């Protein structure tokens, strides 16, 4: 069996990959969201040419092929290439799941079942009281027992979204959500070490348990300093996609919790490797999964399989009113939350079906054996 055709269906925000073998078997994957039309072009220029005609073994064993692409395209290291490779990786995992009539979770040592979530707010343009109303409503209606909200401004160079917002939202949500709800915050690379430490100690007094990306993510020594000065867990790694960076991060003990993103990393295989390296260092893995696309589906499968899975699956609380591009991507409701959990079903592959109407309205490209 070999790969015969690679098709992409894209818009500015999202791009799906359809992989077809010479036997007519099909797998569906996705490249990382945002500027996905650009990523699709990279896919057909720099990923698909190496993959058309690739002979596939009976069981998943294509990690070396992904590395080969990276080596062949060594003049183009970084995020865009790996975002494109993620489309191939995730399509192959879906293919193998369907060939073996198993969910991807079962192929990687996990199993179907429930996965606990934390509700992840993506908004900073919202007052603490308005955010409290949203999160308390989700707590009461969906049984969600952990939430993450935003402090500082994104890459804010030590500036708040507006003056005093960070301290206020910590105080308001800590009080309103109650002691039985786990409270996590995300700084999105905002703060200097000094400011992050000051805010972190304030948050410790308000029951916050997780401080994500407190300093510019590329400044590992700054993040490590914050980790060493605080009692709460410092998390990071969502932006990192290079294995040497991950090895350095883990050797230097920069964070308490690692957060690779399946789509930024180049797919499931490479994310599993980060999780394995973190496990060797005794660190939990709580991957980044910040929207309701295939990234969240892939991540819930992953969390059933790794021994160092974090407490929760990141689960965006933003629907199509905030992210219109998420509307009607899949048939059914693969993101249904019951009592604070989502489910990995027994359906083969990723267990989702992409909406045909969405595909018909996308931009199409193909690479195939002539």
What are these regions (language model features)?
Residues 49, 60, 207, 218-341:
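Shared catalytic-loop signature of beta/alpha-barrel
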Residues 1-28, 32, 321-324, 328-329, ...:
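Structured beta-strand/loop patches that form or line metal/cofactor-binding pockets in enzymes
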Residues 319-370:
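C-terminal extensions of enzymes
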Residues 29, 117-120, 145-149, 183-187, ...:
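Hydrophobic faces of well-ordered beta-strands that scaffold small-molecule active sites
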Residues 24, 47, 88, 101, ...:
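Conserved, mostly hydrophobic/aromatic
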Residues 20-99:
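Metal- or metallocofactor-binding catalytic centers and their adjacent structured scaffolds
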Residues 114-230:
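Metal-dependent enolase-superfamily TIM-barrel catalytic cores that perform enediolate-based chemistry
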Residues 89-125:
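Glycine-rich, aromatic-flanked loop segments that form ligand/cofactor-binding clefts
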